Every structure is written in structure tokens, then in C-alpha cells.
């Protein structure tokens, strides 16, 4: 079994360990999420969910902080780096500290640089991954942050979503598809962005991500029978109309929603960690179908370190 698959399948076990961790957000403080790649996408989702629930939050790439020394006004910066060694994030942490902002590092590595330089750190070393691609640890960290707003037992629900994901995706003839599109609003746009990244990283595919109703305004011109459109839906009527329109044009749709082909529970947006499971598994399956090793994608390393 590949490391990537193993790290996806162990997600329910990872989530079971959340009971040992506590992280609470306050509406009296403003938060800034900082990260690169998947960690930035994670911060984007968390920031969006916080804003939707009356909290003040922003998100920025570590590289932007490193290059331009500009930081949105905030009380607490949450720096996410799976390895704790990503150059841009480590340098961003030091810059942010120089601005007098409290820093919290979230990582899956013991004794990492980010945990040493941050004012506080959350170390989820039981979720450390051997694969280059971030999967289970992404779901875990996002669930930790979600529980900082509202508490949920994601472990049992994740088993259901994982079973549904493997059952549905295993039936797809992925060799038919050469173009992948991910659609979603609000926090689901962040999931779509991450879904696109998973297909790029693991399976080297041509991908797009958009808000659903924006898709008709140009991007739909590339739609063919070789396109798979993944809709992270909020189960509204207009998204359902779009799904039918896409199918009429010959493409295939895969809906992840409360009533979709892959079902997730309705937690008013807080189910968001569970929506990552099917897109991660889809990336893995497409990589295998293409004959690629999802554990070690081309041109990528587990941690980006700049000279």
C-alpha cells in the first residue's frame, strides 16, 4: 500500500485523537493564517469559516510576507507548516514577531524550527506523513481549527464519508478524464482550490477551480466529454441547475453535498474537513491510473527550503 493511501485511510483514527487537543478562537481578537501551498489553502478555508461566523480573520501566503514585509492588522498569527521547516513560513514567523504579533505554529513535526521560534506551538506529531503530498494531516489540522469555533466528533462521520468516497470513485473510469474542474462557494471554494492542487500534485493533471455560477462566464468553453467536474455543493437550486447544464454538454459531474453522489453531513459549513476526503482519494486514484507514484510527485519535495 502506498504511503498516500495509508495516510488517507487513517483519517478517522487521526480525528479520534482530537479529543486530546484544545484550541479556541475569540471574537475579541483578529487572526491571520499564514502558509504555503496546501497550508495556505487550509488557512483560506479556516479564515472563510471564521468570517462567516462573526470572527475577524485574514489569510496570506508566507511568501508574500517574506518578500514584501506587509502584514494585515491582527492580534494572533497562526502559521501552518506540516514539516515545520518551510523556508517562507519560518521567515514569515520571524517577520510577524518583529511586528509584535503573537505567533502560534501548527506542525506535525517534533523539534521543528517553527515550533522553536513561535510564541506557542501545536505539535501533531502522530499525524506526521511520509508522503510528499499533504492529506490526512490537512483534514486533522482543519478539524482542530473548526473545533475552535464549534465542537464536533468528526471521527465517526469521517468513516462514512471515506466509505462513500471509495465506493463512488472506484466505480469511475478515470482513464476517460483529462480535465478536472472543482467548483464551490465560500469555504467550499477553498476545498476546490485544494482539490485542484491534489490533482496537479499527484496526477499531473490540467485543473481549474471556480465559484459555481462563475463557471458559465468563460471557463465552461473548455468543457468536453473528457472533463470531470467536482461540485462541492451547498445543495441550492442554482448549483443543481448548473450540474444539469454541465451534464447536457457531455461532461461528468461528481457532487459532494448533503444529497450528492458522495454525501457529507450538514453541519452548517462545519462539516468542511470531511469534504477534503473524497478529493484526496480522487487525486490518489487518478495518479495510480496514470501510472504515477503519488508518494513522490515529480519536481516536489516534502518541504520547500530556499537557499
Predicted regions and their residues:
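Acidic catalytic cores of enzymes that act on phosphate-bearing nucleotides/polynucleotides
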Residues: 178, 182-254, 262-263
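Glycine-rich phosphate/diphosphate-binding loops that line cofactor/substrate pockets in enzymes
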Residues: 17-31, 168-177, 223
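A general structural motif
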Residues: 15, 160-168, 207-217
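A cross-family phosphate/adenosyl-ligand binding-site feature
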Residues: 1-14, 104, 129-137, 268-277
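A short, charged, Gly/Pro-tolerant segment at domain boundaries
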Residues: 290-307
Amino acid at each position: 500500500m502506498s504511503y498516500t493511501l495509508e495516510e488517507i485511510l487513517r483519517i478517522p483514527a487521526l480525528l479520534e485523537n482530537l479529543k486530546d487537543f484544545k484550541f479556541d478562537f475569540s471574537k475579541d481578537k483578529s487572526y491571520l493564517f499564514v502558509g504555503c501551498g496546501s497550508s495556505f489553502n487550509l488557512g483560506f478555508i479556516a479564515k472563510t469559516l471564521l468570517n462567516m461566523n462573526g470572527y475577524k480573520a485574514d489569510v496570506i501566503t508566507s511568501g508574500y510576507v517574506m518578500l514584501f514585509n506587509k502584514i494585515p492588522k491582527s492580534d494572533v498569527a497562526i502559521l501552518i507548516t506540516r514539516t515545520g521547516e518551510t523556508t517562507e513560513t519560518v521567515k514569515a514567523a520571524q517577520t510577524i514577531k518583529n511586528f509584535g504579533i503573537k505567533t502560534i505554529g501548527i506542525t506535525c513535526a517534533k523539534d521543528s524550527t517553527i515550533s522553536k521560534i513561535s510564541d506557542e506551538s501545536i505539535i501533531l506529531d502522530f499525524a506526521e506523513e511520509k508522503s510528499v503530498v499533504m492529506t490526512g494531516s490537512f483534514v486533522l489540522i482543519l478539524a482542530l481549527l473548526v473545533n475552535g469555533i464549534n465542537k464536533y466528533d468528526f471521527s465517526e462521520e469521517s468513516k462514512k464519508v471515506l466509505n462513500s468516497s471509495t465506493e463512488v470513485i472506484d466505480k469511475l473510469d478515470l482513464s476517460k478524464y483529462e480535465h478536472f474542474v472543482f467548483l464551490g462557494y465560500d469555504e467550499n471554494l477553498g476545498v476546490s482550490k485544494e482539490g485542484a492542487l491534489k490533482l496537479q500534485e499527484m496526477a499531473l493533471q490540467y485543473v481549474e477551480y471556480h465559484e459555481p455560477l462563475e463557471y458559465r462566464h468563460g471557463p465552461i468553453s473548455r468543457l468536453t466529454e473528457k472533463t470531470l467536474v467536482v461540485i462541492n455543493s451547498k445543495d441550492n437550486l442554482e448549483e443543481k441547475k448548473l450540474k444539469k447544464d454541465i451534464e447536457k454538454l457531455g461532461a461528468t459531474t461528481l457532487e459532494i453535498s448533503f444529497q450528492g453522489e458522495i454525501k457529507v453531513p450538514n453541519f452548517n459549513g462545519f462539516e468542511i474537513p470531511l469534504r477534503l476526503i473524497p478529493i484526496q482519494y480522487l487525486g490518489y486514484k487518478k495518479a495510480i491510473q496514470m501510472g504515477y507514484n503519488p508518494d513522490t510527485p515529480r519536481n516536489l519535495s516534502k518541504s520547500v527550503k530556499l537557499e
